[in-house]
Amino acid sequence: MQLGEQLLVSSVNLPGAHFYSLESARGGGGGGGGGGGGGGGSVSLLPGAAPSPQRLDLDKASKKFPGSLPCQAGSAEPAGAGAGAPAAMLSDADAGDTFGSTSAVAKPGPPDGRKGSPCAEEELPSAATAAATARYSMDSLSSERYYLPSPGPQGSELAAPCSLFQYPAAAGAAHGPVYPASNGARYPYGSMLPPGGFPAAVCPPARAQFGPAAGSGSGAGSSGGGAGGPGAYPYGQGSPLYGPYAGTSAAGSCGGLGGLGVPGSGFRAHVYLCNRPLWLKFHRHQTEMIITKQGRRMFPFLSFNINGLNPTAHYNVFVEVVLADPNHWRFQGGKWVTCGKADNNMQGNKMYVHPESPNTGSHWMRQEISFGKLKLTNNKGANNNNTQMIVLQSLHKYQPRLHIVEVTEDGVEDLNEPSKTQTFTFSETQFIAVTAYQNTDITQLKIDHNPFAKGFRDNYDSMYTASENDRLTPSPTDSPRSHQIVPGGRYGVQNFFPEPFVNTLPQARYYNGERTVPQTNGLLSPQQSEEVANPPQRWLVTPVQQPVTNKLDIGSYESEYTSSTLLPYGIKSLPLQTSHALGYYPDPTFPAMAGWGGRGAYQRKMAAGLPWTSRMSPPVFPEDQLAKEKVKEEISSSWIETPPSIKSLDSSDSGVYNSACKRKRLSPSTPSNGNSPPIKCEDINTEEYSKDTSKGMGAYYAFYTSP
């Protein structure tokens, strides 16, 4: 074993160990090889170091090898020690000769040459006291001194949650506490992390790190961190992290943590900004807040968690909004620029006291403290007593500040004790007061995160976050999909659900039929005729499905008609076997068939609850409006109700209804009624409809003439 290793191992237990030079230790180790030559094994002290107050007494040394027999008293003094060698340590050779010669009954040592341990008859000093002064100069590495921390229980306590980043308030100072990095950079954490990291409830009151830090740097929260002392590092070990709280410090300078048991002004609040991530999103684009005459609430609003208060003391908690800089701002070129000086003569209320003030510290620490009802206004004559609206001036930058003031039980503040007032500032809560949003990024953030920002949503589709393919129906502004009566993806649900389930789906699952009617003179545009060239891919209704209304929810053409008036046409479902029947989309028959059968699933009144109905009002469909008026005038005839629904159609297939009307008059199986004379039917056909007939008229004749 080398002498340097012996020094590192054994001197830790020395009560008065000093700094030893390894160079001199190596020199002394070379002369200690002789059996009785102890003089060469002595070690010199560092220059300027005081001599050891006591020499090494082997009788008081620790027992390293319990297997050795006790030594005789007075036999542990080395031969070289009497030659005037300074009180130091023995080399392995010296110790081996001594123990080997004086202990007559000693057992042979281990094969590696180590000898038995010395006697231990007296109690050694505590390990913590010895370790507090155990420092060495490793000149083989560098000229610095390395401090060896004690392995006591204090080191484990410092790893507790209470030793997180310090987070004092910033009051009067431009920045909070700073942590000096290795490269000299300084990082302010004053508006980011709380002073204790965790509430005092998880920290026992009697914590060692809250006591005085003798000889260490001051707490990082009060002076910016003593760069050399252990108190400058939140994860440091050894001496206590935080110095004692000084009640005479400036108000708002949150220093070290105050223990829960310290009375009086030693309580310091620790404040967290609860919705800080949301504030940061707005802060990246320079937050803007709307101000109005009636007052407008802030979004994001101020929300805090408070810890470290005296549970039995009473506090007032209020927010003050002050100017953040002396500049007047304007939005130009996509960014905010200064344009002159701010108006400092603005009169009006600048404070908002929380409605629950005054209250005890335990009340404030129990839950989140929200200022969601705080309103901003530009009305200088706002009543301060009722609404507590904060009066601001447009295009000025403001900084909210949180004040916590200790008061009496009656809510009276002691103005002679400024230390009872604590102020906290969060730089990310700065905002510019505006009468209308200037930055579109801020507007979008308000829409995305504020559930009450309905004034910015001009239509319902802006609330969707899913892609267009994920919707059941398309947007009314899409083209050409908006010109389809039955979009392909709209009724694809019938492939997966049985018919009873589809019929019972709520109407809110589908858009109203008015959204899909083309805004043209005719019902079908040429573009749609091309789209439905292959109709079997879109027609998903089987021939046995009678309630066609549930599939063709065209509310604009069936709102005024009942199934009873069209009963002759709703007895059977339309046969889909013929090629002409499959070409139903350009055929004007189907708009009228939208009213056949039961119409309870889709009502026009349901469209009133949908945000887009204002766009699709009746003026958009003038033909439909005229048709409704004509129906009201001639409601006495059951045959009159059918033609108005197709009166606006300019399709060449309108002769289908012409033939159907004649069949009503000529068929012997269906006698004419008194309220539908044949002449009336002929007049309607002559005045309003074309005489042309479609190619597949035979299919309709065959259908209606069948018994």
UniProtKB/Swiss-Prot annotation:
This is Eomesodermin homolog. Residues 592-707 are annotated as: Required for transcription activation. Residues 648-657 have a biased composition (Polar residues). The modification Phosphoserine is found at residue 117. InterPro entries: p53-like_TF_DNA-bd_sf (IPR008967), T-box_assoc (IPR032385), T-box_DNA-bd (IPR046360), T-box_sf (IPR036960), TF_T-box (IPR001699), TF_T-box_CS (IPR018186). The modification Phosphothreonine is found at residue 473. Functions as a transcriptional activator playing a crucial role during development. Functions in trophoblast differentiation and later in gastrulation, regulating both mesoderm delamination and endoderm specification. Plays a role in brain development being required for the specification and the proliferation of the intermediate progenitor cells and their progeny in the cerebral cortex. Required for differentiation and migration of unipolar dendritic brush cells. Also involved in the differentiation of CD8+ T-cells during immune response regulating the expression of lytic effector genes. Pfam families: T-box (PF00907), T-box_assoc (PF16176). Residues 27-42 have a biased composition (Gly residues). Expressed in CD8+ T-cells. Residues 680-689 have a biased composition (Basic and acidic residues). Residues 73-93, 667-678 have a biased composition (Low complexity). Induction: Up-regulated in CD8+ T-cells upon activation. GO terms for cellular component: chromatin; nucleoplasm; nucleus. One of its GO terms (molecular function) is sequence-specific DNA binding. One of its GO terms (biological process) is cell differentiation. Disruption phenotype: Embryonic lethal due to peri-implantation defects. Mutant embryos arrest soon after implantation and fail to form organized embryonic or extraembryonic structures. Conditional mutants, with expression abrogated in the inner cell mass of embryos from early implantation stages onward, display gastrulation defects. Residues 278-458 bind DNA. Keywords: Activator, Adaptive immunity, Developmental protein, Differentiation, DNA-binding, Gastrulation, Immunity, Nucleus, Phosphoprotein, Transcription, Transcription regulation. Residues 27-125, 642-689 are annotated as: Disordered. It is found in: Nucleus. SMART domains: TBOX (SM00425).
